[in-house]
C-alpha cells in the first residue's frame, strides 16, 4: 500500500489515489497476467504502441493476433485472451472436418471433436494469451488442406481445382511459421505427404505412355505452383509479420533496414534456445509427455487455510494414455501387418496421421534445452485421431462393439469434470486439490503446494 504522505499537498500525488475502486482487492488470473502472458500479452501492447519489443524469441504473428483483442477491448485480461479463445473454439470445427475427411463417418468426427474439447490441456492452452493456440490452429488447417489435396484424383481433376486446397495449405503453412517456428516441423510432414502422393501416382502411370506424359505435365505445373505458395508467399507473410518491428525501428535515429532487421532477428532466435541452460520445476522430457507425468503449473494462489485456486496445464489421462496406446497399435497395424481387411482409404488416412505425428513430435527428441508437456500440444490432436482410426478398424471388423467409443467419451467427460477446478482456477477445497494430486492419476499438478 502507498503511504498517505505521498499524496499530501501535491496534485501529482493525489492523482495516484483518486481511483481506488479500480484496484483489485486481491490479484489473480482474473485481473492480471499469468505464466507466459507476461511475455506475449505485454509484447502485443508494445506492438500497438510502437514500443521496444520485449518478447522476440518467436515470430510476431501470434502476438499481432493477441494485439487485435487489445485494440478492441483494451489492455485487460479479456482483451488479451479473447482472440486465443476464439481460435481455440474455431479449432473444433476444423478438427471435425479433418476427422470426417479421414474417417468418412460423422459419428467418429463428432467423437474426435468432442474428445479434443474435453482435453484439459486444450482447455487451458486456449484460455491463455500465448502463441501456442495459433500454431496448432494453422497446423490443423495445413493437414486438412493437404488431406483434401491427396484425396483428389490427381490425373482426372482440373489443375485449377487441385490447386485450391494446395494453395490454402501453403498459406496456412506461412501463417503457422509466422506464429511459431514449430510450423516448420509440420511443414516437413507436409512435404513427405506431398512427395509420397506424387511418387505413388507416378508409379501408377509408368506403364501408360499417355498417362505418363500427362503426369509430368501436371507435375511440372504443380511444382511451379508450390514454389509460389510454399516458398514465396510464406516468406512474404513472414516478412510482413515484422511490421511492428519496422514501425519501432523507424522511430530511431539510426534504425536498421527492414531486411537487415528481419535477418538479425532470425539469427537471435536461432541462437536463443541452444544457449538457454536454465532448468525449471515443471520441465519434462519428450518421452514423458504422452503419459502426463508432469504438468505445467500456470498459476496457484492459496485462499486461506482450506481453499486454493490453481491452473495446471496437463493432458487428461483418459485421453492421452488411451490415445498413445491406440496410436502405437495403429502404427503396428498400418506398417507391419499389411492385411487385406483395411481399405485403401483407411491405409491412406493412417499414413497421413502417422506422418503428422512423427513430424510434430520427433524433432523434440533433438532439442537440448529444457522442455515442457505443453510442447506435445501440437501433436496430441493427431494422436487422438490415430487412436480413433484404429478404433474404427476394430469396430468395422467386428472386434469391438460400437459402444466402446461412447464409453470412452463418457469417461473423458467425467475426467474433465473432475479436473475442471485444477484447469480453470476455480477455487476448490484444499482437500479436493490433495485428492487430485495424490489419488487421481493426473501426474504432478501442484508440486506439493497442497
PLM regions and their residue ranges:
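Transmembrane helical bundles and short interhelical boundary loops of multi-pass, membrane-embedded
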Residues: 1-20, 26-29, 161, 165-168, ...
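Loop-to-helix entry region of an early transmembrane alpha helix in multi-pass inner-membrane enzymes
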Residues: 56-66, 73-93, 110-113, 125, ...
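Transmembrane-helix motifs of polytopic, lipid-linked glycan transferases
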Residues: 82-103, 141-145
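Short acidic/glycine- and proline-prone juxtamembrane loop motifs at membrane-interface regions
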Residues: 84, 121-134, 179-182
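Transmembrane-helix signature of polytopic, membrane-embedded enzymes
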Residues: 95-118, 136-137, 154-164
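Membrane-interface transmembrane helices that cradle and orient dolichyl/undecaprenyl
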Residues: 100, 142-165, 195-205
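Short helix- or helix-capping micro-motifs
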Residues: 112-117, 124, 144, 173, ...
Amino acid at each position: 500500500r502507498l503511504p498517505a504522505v505521498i499524496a499530501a499537498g501535491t496534485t501529482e500525488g493525489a492523482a495516484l489515489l483518486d481511483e481506488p475502486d479500480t484496484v483489485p482487492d486481491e490479484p489473480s488470473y482474473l485481473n492480471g497476467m499469468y505464466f507466459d502472458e507476461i511475455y506475449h500479452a505485454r509484447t502485443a501492447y508494445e506492438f500497438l504502441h510502437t514500443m521496444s519489443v520485449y518478447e522476440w524469441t518467436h515470430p510476431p504473428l501470434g502476438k499481432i493476433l493477441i494485439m487485435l483483442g487489445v485494440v478492441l477491448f483494451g489492455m485487460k485480461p479479456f482483451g488479451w485472451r479473447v482472440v486465443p479463445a476464439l481460435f481455440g473454439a474455431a479449432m473444433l470445427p476444423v478438427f471435425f472436418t479433418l476427422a470426417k475427411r479421414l474417417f468418412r463417418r460423422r459419428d467418429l468426427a463428432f467423437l474426435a471433436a468432442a474428445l479434443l474439447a474435453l482435453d484439459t490441456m486444450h482447455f487451458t492452452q486456449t484460455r491463455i494469451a500465448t502463441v501456442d493456440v495459433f500454431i496448432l490452429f494453422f497446423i490443423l488447417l495445413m493437414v486438412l488442406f493437404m488431406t483434401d489435396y491427396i484425396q483428389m484424383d490427381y490425373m482426372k481433376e482440373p489443375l485449377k481445382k487441385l490447386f485450391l486446397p494446395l494453395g490454402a495449405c501453403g498459406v496456412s503453412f506461412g501463417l503457422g511459421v509466422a506464429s511459431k517456428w514449430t510450423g516448420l516441423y509440420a511443414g516437413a510432414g507436409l512435404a513427405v505427404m506431398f512427395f509420397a502422393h506424387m511418387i505413388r501416382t507416378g508409379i501408377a502411370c509408368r506403364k501408360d505412355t499417355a498417362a505418363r506424359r500427362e503426369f509430368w505435365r501436371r507435375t511440372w505445373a504443380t511444382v511451379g505452383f508450390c514454389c509460389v505458395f510454399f516458398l514465396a508467399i510464406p516468406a512474404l507473410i513472414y516478412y510482413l509479420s515484422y511490421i511492428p518491428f519496422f514501425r519501432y525501428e523507424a522511430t530511431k535515429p539510426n534504425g536498421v533496414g527492414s531486411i537487415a532487421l528481419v535477418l538479425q532477428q532470425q539469427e537471435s532466435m536461432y541462437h536463443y534456445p541452444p544457449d538457454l541452460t536454465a532448468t525449471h520445476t515443471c520441465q519434462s522430457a519428450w518421452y514423458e509427455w504422452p503419459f502426463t507425468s508432469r504438468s505445467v503449473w500456470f498459476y496457484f494462489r492459496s485462499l486461506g487455510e482450506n481453499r486454493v485456486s490453481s491452473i495446471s496445464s496437463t493432458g487428461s489421462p483418459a485421453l492421452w494414455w488411451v490415445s498413445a496406446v491406440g496410436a502405437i497399435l495403429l502404427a503396428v497395424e498400418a506398417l507391419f501387418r499389411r492385411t487385406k481387411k483395411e481399405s485403401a482409404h483407411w491405409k491412406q488416412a493412417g499414413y497421413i496421421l502417422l506422418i503428422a505425428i512423427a513430424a510434430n513430435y520427433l524433432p523434440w527428441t533433438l532439442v537440448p534445452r529444457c522442455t515442457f508437456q505443453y510442447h506435445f500440444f501440437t501433436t496430441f490432436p493427431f494422436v487422438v485421431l490415430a487412436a480413433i482410426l484404429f478404433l474404427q478398424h476394430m469396430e468395422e471388423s467386428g472386434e469391438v462393439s460400437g459402444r466402446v467409443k461412447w464409453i470412452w467419451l463418457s469417461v473423458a467427460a467425467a475426467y474433465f469434470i473432475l479436473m475442471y477446478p485444477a484447469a480453470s482456477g476455480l477455487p476448490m477445497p484444499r482437500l479436493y486439490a490433495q485428492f487430485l494430486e495424490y489419488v487421481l492419476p493426473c501426474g504432478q499438478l501442484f508440486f506439493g503446494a497442497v
